């Protein structure tokens, strides 16, 4: 199967679980939910969701992979002061656990931020997965779907960076432009993205 394996660490957030159910119903991705299965199924029942049983549910508190992931976290971060004890504790954080699943090759991506701040979402990704080679500036991109097909690609725009680097310099802006175009190609399937750079003159 060429379906992407997507981790959802915020499994008890209602919008997240509903989106997971929709993705499972449409068979557009393999979904990995992080959390306690009983709590996840209880919320699914409350929300009337029918497809959550098709997801892989992993509870860091009981998973046989937890010790392996904790050791990986320790190895990745020991030069930054990580200890085995700290790693054993931090691996229980769903955001860290999800990034470790990806780093181990057991998943392809993670979606979070419904309950977590941008900083909380990015921190484990930067510590564990890190930036692509040659990229030193972290940036975010969002898909904007409009009702106006002449905008972007059939009404879809990819906008970056709106959340991560508040006052980028020229070099950072160049990297953000390149990364946003790559996101437009890989995520939004744009054939040949046109990049426009906008700058506001003063703060509001």
Protein language model regions, located:
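Anion-binding alpha/beta catalytic cores of soluble intermediary-metabolism enzymes, centered on
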Residues: 1-204
């Amino acid at each position: 199967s060429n379906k992407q394996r997507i981790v959802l660490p915020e499994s008890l957030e209602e919008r997240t679980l509903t989106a997971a159910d929709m993705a499972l119903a449409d068979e557009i991705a393999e979904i990995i939910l992080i959390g306690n299965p009983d709590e996840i199924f209880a919320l699914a029942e409350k929300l009337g969701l029918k497809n959550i049983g098709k997801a892989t549910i992993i509870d860091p508190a009981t998973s046989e992979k937890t010790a392996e992931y904790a050791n990986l976290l320790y190895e990745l971060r020991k030069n930054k002061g990580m200890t085995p004890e700290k790693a054993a504790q931090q691996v229980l954080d769903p955001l860290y656990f999800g990034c470790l699943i990806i780093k181990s090759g057991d998943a392809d991506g993670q979606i979070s931020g419904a309950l977590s701040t941008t900083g909380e979402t990015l921190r484990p990704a930067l510590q564990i997965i890190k930036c692509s080679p040659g990229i030193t500036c972290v940036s975010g991109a969002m898909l904007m779907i409009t009702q106006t097909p002449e905008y972007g690609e059939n009404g879809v725009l990819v906008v970056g960076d709106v959340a991560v680097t508040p006052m980028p310099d020229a070099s950072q802006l160049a990297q953000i432009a390149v990364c946003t175009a790559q996101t437009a190609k890989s995520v939004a399937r744009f054939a040949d993205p046109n990049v426009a750079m906008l700058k506001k003159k003063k703060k509001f």
